[in-house]
Amino acid sequence: MFTSIAGRAVVVTGGSRGIGKGIAAVFARNGARVLITGRSEQDLAATAEELGVSYLAADVASKADCELVAGCAADRLGGIDVLCANAGIFPDARLADMTEEDIDRVLGTNLKGTILSVQACLPLLARSGRGRVILTSSITGPITGYPGWTHYGASKAGQLGFMRTAAIELARDGITVNAVLPGNILTEGLAGLGEDYIAGMTSAIPMRKLGSVDDIGYAALFLATDEAAYITGQTIVVDGGQVLPESPEAVS
């Protein structure tokens, strides 16, 4: 039986849709007090009402906005025990055609946004005495590659470099830093890639199905428990075995 996280203060960036919404829902169902952030006030308000959580419109690529999130968490939640740095985007752009703006957008949200979010929340996480930072990375970049996502893959691999060094620096404050690496998870964004993409990816997964947002939420929940207190600088891959086969024939 895991220690309850009921009552703990949890911030989920990018929490209005997709994986972030799933993470927020899992924590809320387990009694945590949750603040979600994102750029769309409309999406945030709808999700907050559905899940019974607080929200604040903010852009993780902005240092000032990240500091507002920390201040809001202090006011509404009384602090931060868990930061789920989840905000991320994955627009398609082939390397030959990729613009400087494309690169800045993806790295700004996925990598810079992760660093700024953690940095802004550090004082509150340290004050918690059992602070947890949980990054949503990806199998794409750290383990695999996919055409059109060179900037995305670079941002996600960069998150893990940040995670490992941050885990060392923050250990003295009792803060752990870990990451969940989702494979293909059924979200609005993934559905938008089309039926052919989904069918192709499903056929490459040994479990022959896409993951759910709950699968990621429960991995994050575990890393937030007292039982995971001695785990830091590590990753949990949640992909149905997608990265395991040596060739397509291995799962045929």
Task: Give the positions of each predicted feature.
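Substrate-binding pocket helix/loop in short-chain dehydrogenase/reductase
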Residues: R94-L95, D102-L107, L190, M201
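Alpha-helical segment proximal to the catalytic Tyr-Lys
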Residues: P123, I168-E169, A229
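Short C-terminal tail/terminal secondary-structure segment
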Residues: T232-S252
